[in-house]
Design a protein with these regions (language model features):
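Substrate/ligand-engaging "lid" and interaction regions
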Residues: 1-280
Length: 280
């Protein structure tokens, strides 16, 4: 119902794995099919070796992803097109894209282990080699938080309002965890930058839910046999999906409530409810 030519980028997403492509990218695809928020398309990137492989795979198929929902009734396949581009990890073009005023949200899925949390304290741990490297060489970031900071610093220097930073990882208070990591690294680099980030940058908390297993040759074969679709990296997932998000986006956001995202002032009650259901 839409073509890539109709879309304009508004979000850079760091860490384009299966969950992102079965969750955030699906919601945006559904929104674009309604003809809404067409200036909020995705640009992917990453900081891990696997991100480069993902980018190369997606580039070969025009950044399209086949998402296959599994249920008792069988399989349902949808080709999604909410991503416009994938930036090569480590390239300076990443910082320039984050500094582009059209980018109003930077989102990320880097898994729980990617937030540099000390398991003993539960707090941000600055004593990590990758963080020390980003503190010493902020212009060549190797972590998601170093990349986010490089983009924010460039916007600050150029007088461009900061983008919102939106974690899409399955973590309690994921926005607060992200905020601690970004500000923690900023304090290692530049105290004035850290103060500006703390004062000006939004880190909305969100609750995400969708079971999305890894992709293997089995899934590729099912897709080919059931639907006749060849996809280098399809995504299989459950048919249940949920996203509850704090409505804190100073530069605006896509109209995701039109496709079922719940916007709230505080996500905490929803997190507690999810934990009670899981523990029941």
């Amino acid at each position: 119902n839409y073509s890539p030519q109709q879309l304009k980028p508004g979000i850079v997403h760091i860490g384009v794995g299966n969950f992102h492509r079965a969750h955030q990218a699906v919601y945006l695809d559904q929104l674009f099919r309604l003809g809404k928020s067409l200036d909020w398309a995705l640009v992917g990137t990453g900081v891990m070796p696997g991100d480069r492989v993902m980018g190369q795979t997606l580039a070969q198929q025009d950044y399209l992803t086949t998402v296959v929902e599994q249920s008792a009734a069988g399989y349902k396949a949808t080709v999604t097109g909410s991503m416009l581009d994938f930036l090569p990890p480590g390239d300076p073009v990443n910082i320039e894209r984050l500094a582009d005023p059209s980018i109003r949200i930077v989102s990320l899925t880097v898994t729980e282990g990617g937030y540099f949390i000390n398991p003993a304290t539960g707090e941000f741990d600055p004593d990590q080699p990758a963080l020390r490297q980003d503190a010493a060489s902020p212009e060549t970031p190797t972590t998601a938080f170093g990349l986010i900071l490089a983009g924010l610093r460039t916007r600050l220097v150029r007088g461009i309002a900061p983008f919102a930073v939106m974690s899409c990882d399955n973590l309690l208070h994921n926005g607060n965890v992200t905020r601690n990591a970004v500000i923690g690294l900023a304090e290692m680099q530049d105290s004035k930058l850290a103060a500006w980030v703390e004062r000006e940058v939004a880190f909305p908390n969100g609750m995400v839910d969708r079971i999305t297993p890894a992709t293997s040759d089995r899934e590729r074969s099912i897709l080919q046999e059931e639907f006749g679709i060849e996809d280098g990296w399809p995504v299989f997932c459950e048919n249940y999906i949920q996203w509850v998000l704090e409505d804190h986006f100073p530069l605006g956001r896509p109209e995701l409530e039109a496709v079922g995202v719940t916007f709230v002032p505080d996500v905490t009650p929803y997190e507690h409810m999810k934990l009670r259901i899981l523990n029941a």
